[in-house]
Regions:
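Alpha-helical interface subdomain recognition
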Residues: 3-135
């Protein structure tokens, strides 16, 4: 690596940035979907979407920050960049709002319950294509 090379031009760093942007947009859409569910269905029914957001967003943020740390190498965990502090804060948030497993359990339990109801109603594959709150 030449000292003049820009970090973005090395290896798969362009792909890492692309994946990060796509994941950030997916997280934003998921938060918007949870907010819409709160407005339309009410807080009690929207708790499944809220749990999904609480599980997904901090987890994906940690992944994105981790990729940035990898991209920067040893400098990524130094005090030259805020990445180590960002990762630490996001990892703490994953525990502060309840373990990820609890949020995943809420989503999975609702998914199984909705799937069983769809099968007993004869909807079968239609449920798999749209989910319980499909537009």
């Amino acid at each position: 690596m030449c000292i003049r090379d820009r970090l973005i031009q090395l290896g798969k760093n362009m792909e890492v940035v692309s994946r990060a942007r796509i994941e950030i947009e997916a997280m934003r859409l998921m938060v918007l979907r949870a907010a819409k569910a709160m407005d339309v269905l009410g807080n009690a029914e929207a708790r499944i979407w809220v749990s999904a957001v609480k599980a997904m967003v901090p987890e994906k943020c940690c992944d994105i920050i981790n990729e940035a740390i990898q991209m920067h190498g040893a400098a990524g965990i130094s005090q030259w960049y805020p990445l180590a502090d960002m990762w630490h804060s996001q990892r703490t948030l994953r525990l502060a709002d309840g373990p990820d497993e609890v949020h995943h359990h809420v989503v999975a339990r609702a998914e199984v319950r909705n799937r069983e109801a769809a099968v007993s109603a004869g909807e079968g594959l239609n449920y798999a294509l749209g989910g319980p709150y499909a537009d």
